[in-house]
Amino acid sequence: RVSMPVKPKQMPISLDNMLESFHNIDVNAFPEMRNYKRFYDDMNDFIDKIVPIPSVKNYTLRFLSKCLSGENRDEGFYIWTGTGGNGKSKLIDLMSMCMGDYSCNLPIALLTQKRKASGAASPEMAVTKGKRLAVMQEPDVNETLNVGQMKEITGNDKISARGLYKEPFEFTPQFKLICMCNDL
């Protein structure tokens, strides 16, 4: 049994919200890790190759760790840019694999097209409920981002969503939104 320094009702977010996708995680998949040191060294080597500048590496790791919290205090839209083949996607693939159902991919059209009519189905947004990390790929050259839509998604306010043939519901997004770009 674990003792917590604060009571669950005093926490800024409900423990139930933090653990809503826990049923999809196999906690017995790795009962013991015999080669932890090797794993740790391999992970550090991998991240050092992708993010060789120490200050940028620290920022990146801090950002990725913030994805786990389910809080969006920063209200940010993050653009990861750089030449193709520099490891951006591999790092996101690793993070997505680690986060399982807590991560998702979103179409960039969510930010490049006009807002949908009120009450229209929005399955892209409905799927983000409870997610901690959402990733988009770069827009086409002539596309512009709908800043109002971006603010709505990342602004830490409740949004309304509706899956196909479902009733609308409101929720506060918990995810960090990353757009992966080779060019800006």
What is the predicted function of each stretch?
Residues 2-130:
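P-loop NTPase catalytic core of nucleic-acid-dependent motor ATPases
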Residues 49, 156-160, 180:
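A Trp-anchored, charged/polar loop motif used as the substrate-binding/catalytic surface
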Residues 65, 79-82, 135-136, 178-181:
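Short beta-strand segments
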Residues 85, 118, 136-143, 164, ...:
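Hydrophobic alpha-helical scaffolding
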Residues 106-121, 148-167:
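Substrate-gripping "pore-loop 1 plus following alpha2 helix"
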Residues 123-129, 162-180:
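AAA+/SF3 P-loop NTPase mechanochemical coupling elements
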Residues 130-154, 169:
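Conserved AAA+/SF3 P-loop NTPase catalytic/coupling segment centered on the Walker-B
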Residues 140-141, 182-184:
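Conserved nucleotide-binding/hydrolysis micro-motifs of P-loop NTPases
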